[in-house]
UniProtKB/Swiss-Prot annotation:
Pyruvate binds at T47, I206. Keywords: Amino-acid biosynthesis, Cytoplasm, Diaminopimelate biosynthesis, Lyase, Lysine biosynthesis, Schiff base. SMART domains: DHDPS. The record marks T46, Y110 as: Part of a proton relay during catalysis. Pathway: Amino-acid biosynthesis; L-lysine biosynthesis via DAP pathway; (S)-tetrahydrodipicolinate from L-aspartate: step 3/4. It catalyses: L-aspartate 4-semialdehyde + pyruvate = (2S,4S)-4-hydroxy-2,3,4,5-tetrahydrodipicolinate + H2O + H(+). InterPro entries: Aldolase_TIM, DapA, DapA-like, Schiff_base-form_aldolases_AS, Schiff_base-form_aldolases_CS. This is 4-hydroxy-tetrahydrodipicolinate synthase. The active site is at Y136 (proton donor/acceptor), K164 (schiff-base intermediate with substrate). It comes from Listeria monocytogenes serotype 4a (strain HCC23). It holds the Pfam family DHDPS.
Length: 293
């Protein structure tokens, strides 16, 4: 299964007055992303503020994205949690919606399982799931790192098709790529590491920056794949200040700020996250405007 090169970890549009997942804004955002470089979308992931979405809100979100997408982009639903049984049940429920291509399963957070526990968790979900599974390794948030040896073992299971690697450890990522099959897809979970991970054999990126520079992210990857490494490196350097700026305060507040400024209304972030203040917003806007100079 080819999930694409640029997969956007989509923000969740929230109505600013009603504090509800907003159907109209979802429709607008999905079309914007697909028309501007996104091969696929991750729905209800970290950038989608999944911890503050209820079960019913996630289902509503999935349904609306499926309807708007109409088969154009690959859809990956975030169905993971730190409860294996709950993850399995929710993944099965999402599979019944139709229109979802794969699920993203985050490393269990807070519980701090060891490597045997991590393997057993992902193996149980993969065995029970009708949808292909993408592992999500993000030790900065989940506290535990899925070691490359564990990911390599999991990659041998028939229903585990890839990993979103947000560890930032290129040595580990290189080992995963070297010791898994060619059809196991390794995605950068950090925009700034997209090009380095491509250079060691990765497939693409699950991106935040692609909300606002999706075409440029595509151009960078395509240039690299054509062998135009210097051009790809130049694009990387040009985009790097924005990639870093989007994490100047906790994600996805900066991304939502820029989208709202561009007329793509996605509303605020939910507490305990807070929106950018005026000074933060001005600095971020200046970074974006600097890209075109």
């Amino acid at each position: 299964m080819d999930l694409g090169k640029v997969i956007t970890a989509m923000v969740t549009p929230i109505h600013p007055e009603k504090d509800k997942v907003c159907k109209k804004r979802i429709h607008h955002l999905v079309n914007h992303l697909i028309e501007n470089g996104s091969d696929g979308l991750v729905i209800a992931g970290t950038t989608g503020e999944s911890p503050t979405l209820s079960h019913d809100e996630k289902i509503k979100l999935f349904r609306q994205v499926i309807e708007t997408n109409d088969g154009r982009a690959k859809l990956i639903a975030g169905t993971g949690s730190n409860n294996t049984a709950e993850t399995i049940a929710f993944t099965k429920e999402v599979a019944e919606l139709g229109g979802i291509d794969a699920v993203l399963i985050v490393a269990p957070y807070y519980n701090k399982p060891n490597q045997d526990g991590l393997y057993a968790h992902f193996a149980a979900v993969a065995e029970a799931s009708d949808l292909p599974v993408v592992i999500y390794n993000i030790p900065g948030r989940s506290v535990v790192n899925i070691e490359p040896e564990t990911i390599i073992r999991l990659a041998a299971l028939p229903n585990i098709v890839g990993v979103k690697e947000s560890s930032g450890n290129l040595d580990n990522i290189s080992k995963i790529i070297a010791e898994t099959s060619d059809d196991f897809q390794v995605y950068s979970g950090d925009d700034s590491l997209t090009l380095p991970i491509l250079a060691v054999g990765g497939n693409g990126v699950i991106s935040v920056a692609s909300h606002v520079v999706g075409n440029e992210m595509q151009e960078m990857i395509q240039a690299f794949e054509r062998g135009e490494v210097q051009k790809a490196a130049q694009i990387h350097r040009e985009l790097l200040p924005l990639m870093n700026g989007l994490f100047s305060v906790p994600n996805p507040a900066p991304t939502k700020y820029l989208l709202n400024q561009q007329g793509i209304s996605v509303g605020p972030v939910r507490l305990p996250l807070v929106d950018l203040n005026a000074e933060q917003g001005t600095k971020l806007q200046a970074i974006l405007e600097g890209l075109s100079k």
